[in-house]
C-alpha cells in the first residue's frame, strides 16, 4: 500500500510535468513541496528537466537544503531558494521557480506585474522585485548560496510571487494544487498584460477585486477543476490518457411500449 510519502512523490512528479506541459517550465526550473509528515523537510527532484521528472527522482531534503540520503546523481544548484522560503514561511507548502518567457520582460524592464484579469488575481495585491545586487553586488544571477536564498525569501515577504532581476520568478502556495494554479495563471496574466499594454493604458484589478477574485479562484472547486484539466492534457501529451467509457442510459419507464389489449379489431 502506498505511503503518504509515496503519494507525495507521485503528485510532485506530476506537478513538475504538468507545469512544463503548459509551457511555463522548460529545461530549467523546479517544483517542490513540503514533506507530508515532517514540516522540517521538503521534497525535490534530482537535477533534470521538469518535463522528465518521475516519482523515483524525488528525494528528501532538510530546510538547509541538504539531501537526507546522498545519491550519485546531480542535485539542483538553486535548491536553497526552496529551503529558505520554507524556513521563512510556515504557511508555504509548495514552491516553483521558473523562467517563463512571458515573465522575463518584467524581470528585465522592472515593469510592475499586476493582476489584469480575474484568474490572474491569485498573484495577490503585490509582486515584489528582487535584485541580487542590493545585497551581493554583481553575481552569476544564480541563487546557489543559503544567504542568497534567504535574501530572496525576505524579498518575497508575505506575498506569493517574487520577480528576480534578469532571471525569472519564484511562486509559493499553501498547497501543491494551489501552486500549480497560481504558477500557470501568473504566466498567462503576464502575457495578457504585455499584449494589452501594446493597445494602450492597462487598468489592473483594483485591490478589492484582487482580493475577492483571488479568494474565489482558490476555492477547492476551481482549483480541482483546473488540476483535472491540466492533468488530462498531460496524459494526452504523454499518450497515457484513456477516454472514459460512455454510459448507456436505461430507458425511462414512461418510454416503455405498452402492449395492446387483445380483442377483435373494430370495423371501420
Where are these regions (language model features)?
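Glycine-rich flexible loops
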Residues: 1-268
Amino acid at each position: 500500500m502506498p505511503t503518504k510519502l509515496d503519494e507525495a512523490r507521485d503528485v510532485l512528479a506530476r506537478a513538475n510535468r504538468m507545469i512544463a506541459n503548459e509551457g511555463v517550465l522548460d529545461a530549467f526550473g523546479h517544483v517542490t513541496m513540503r514533506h507530508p509528515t515532517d514540516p522540517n523537510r521538503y521534497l525535490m527532484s534530482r537535477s533534470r528537466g521538469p518535463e522528465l521528472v518521475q516519482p523515483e527522482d524525488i528525494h528528501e531534503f532538510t530546510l538547509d537544503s541538504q539531501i537526507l540520503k546522498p545519491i550519485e546523481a546531480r542535485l539542483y544548484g538553486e535548491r536553497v531558494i526552496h529551503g529558505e522560503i520554507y524556513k521563512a514561511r510556515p504557511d508555504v507548502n509548495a514552491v516553483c521557480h521558473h523562467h517563463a518567457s512571458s515573465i522575463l520582460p518584467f524581470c528585465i524592464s522592472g515593469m510592475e506585474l499586476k493582476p489584469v484579469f480575474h484568474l490572474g488575481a491569485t498573484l495577490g495585491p503585490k509582486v515584489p522585485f528582487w535584485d541580487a545586487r542590493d545585497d551581493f553586488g554583481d553575481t552569476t544571477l544564480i541563487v546557489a548560496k543559503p544567504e542568497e536564498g534567504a535574501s530572496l525569501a525576505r524579498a518575497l515577504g508575505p506575498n506569493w510571487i517574487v520577480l528576480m532581476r534578469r532571471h525569472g520568478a519564484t511562486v509559493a502556495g499553501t498547497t501543491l494544487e494551489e501552486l500549480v494554479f497560481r504558477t500557470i495563471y501568473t504566466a498567462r496574466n503576464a502575457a495578457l498584460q504585455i499584449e494589452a499594454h501594446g493597445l494602450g493604458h492597462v487598468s489592473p484589478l483594483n485591490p478589492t477585486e484582487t482580493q475577492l477574485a483571488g479568494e474565489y479562484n482558490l476555492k477547492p472547486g476551481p482549483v480541482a477543476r483546473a488540476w483535472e484539466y491540466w492533468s488530462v492534457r498531460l496524459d494526452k501529451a504523454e499518450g497515457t490518457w484513456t477516454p472514459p467509457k460512455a454510459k448507456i442510459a436505461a430507458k425511462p419507464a414512461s418510454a416503455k411500449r405498452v402492449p395492446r389489449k387483445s380483442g377483435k379489431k373494430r370495423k371501420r
